[in-house]
């Protein structure tokens, strides 16, 4: 299966998408924060970023979901900064403290091609939202030099439908992390307004574009939606409503990775309710609930 950008778009169309995305940076509305920062003129957005791209690391990753990892790894590019401000972020040095190095569009294109050369199964863009125009610029260069891997958009779910529509037929695999169904908690712990309604609209748009996750005969992800959800202590995430949304409004064939690896990090120690690992029973409760809703892809229901 060809990547969507080779199957659906011409090079002039891809360049037009990049130009349209760049217009969203002028008074920034690339994400639902809509902070209006003039990033193209050197102002810093809510994401702590100007127009220059910063990357913390590039390489094959073997800790992602099995359909992404395959045998040779997922070709991850970790972008610095984030449009969320999660107080328990486990990658806070990258997302909040700005760890990373400046990368031109040529650098980024070169990284994509290197990941392809070493055999990675995909280009996995980690926290790409705030740099999506520049990423498409780099994709143009990489495609001209032979890139033919599927693109994974690995994000925190706080996405603008306007931006997502400009990414249609560019992204093959959307991988949003649905963090909360409780807006009050999204504001308190991640600093964003109206998260629940926003993430639902975004995930519906993603699914409309790419459908349920499709695998090759070897079990490698080729196209579709893969949803993540991290169970938080004391049900701070509102996990059952997230499961209901996926099962009832997306598809019971959704690949849903219900994650149990929460550990207190960054500023979690400030919040007693966040300052512990989840219990086995908290996790099992969500898994059992998802199984009863008919969801089985992405986790062991037993």
Model-derived segments and their meaning:
Residues 139-150, 201-206, 280-286:
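Alpha-helix-loop-beta-strand connector modules within alpha/beta enzyme cores
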Residues 187-218:
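Anionic-ligand binding region
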Residues 1-43, 211-302:
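Auxiliary Fe-S-binding modules of radical SAM enzymes
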Residues 168-183, 253-262:
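Non-cysteine beta-strand/loop elements that form the S-adenosyl-L-methionine
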Residues 95, 132, 157-160, 178-196, ...:
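Conserved radical SAM core fold
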Residues 105-108, 135, 199, 203, ...:
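Aromatic/hydrophobic pocket-lining residues that form the small-molecule binding cavity
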Residues 47-173, 182-183:
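Conserved Radical SAM active-site core
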Residues 75, 123, 151-153, 174-176, ...:
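Hydrophobic faces of well-ordered beta-strands that scaffold small-molecule active sites
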């Amino acid at each position: 299966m060809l990547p969507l950008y080779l199957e659906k778009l011409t090079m002039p169309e891809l360049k037009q998408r990049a130009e349209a995305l760049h217009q969203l940076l002028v008074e920034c509305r690339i994400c639902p924060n809509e902070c209006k920062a003039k990033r193209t003129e050197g102002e810093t957005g809510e994401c702590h970023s100007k127009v220059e791209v910063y990357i913390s690391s590039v390489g094959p990753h073997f800790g992602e979901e099995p359909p992404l990892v395959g045998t040779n790894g997922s070709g991850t590019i970790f972008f610095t900064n984030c449009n969320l401000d999660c107080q328990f972020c486990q990658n806070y040095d990258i997302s909040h403290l700005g760890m990373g190095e400046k990368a031109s569009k040529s650098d980024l294109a070169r990284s994509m091609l290197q990941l392809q050369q070493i055999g990675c199964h995909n280009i996995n863009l980690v926290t790409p939202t705030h740099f999506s125009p520049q990423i498409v610029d780099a994709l143009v260069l990489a495609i001209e030099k032979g890139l033919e891997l599927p693109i994974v958009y690995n994000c925190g779910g706080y996405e603008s439908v306007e931006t997502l529509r400009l990414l249609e037929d560019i992204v093959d695999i959307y991988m949003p992390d649905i963090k909360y169904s409780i807006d009050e908690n999204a504001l308190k712990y991640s600093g964003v307004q109206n998260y629940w309604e926003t993430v639902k609209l975004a995930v519906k748009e993603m699914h409309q574009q790419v459908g349920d996750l499709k695998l090759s005969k070897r079990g490698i992800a080729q196209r579709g939606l893969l949803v993540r959800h991290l169970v938080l202590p004391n049900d701070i995430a509102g996990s059952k409503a997230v499961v209901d949304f996926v099962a009832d409004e997306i598809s019971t064939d959704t690949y849903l990775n219900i994650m149990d690896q929460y550990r207190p990090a960054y500023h979690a120690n400030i919040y007693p309710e966040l300052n512990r690992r989840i219990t086995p029973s908290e996790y099992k409760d969500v898994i059992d609930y998802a199984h009863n809703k008919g969801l089985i892809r992405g986790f062991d229901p037993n």
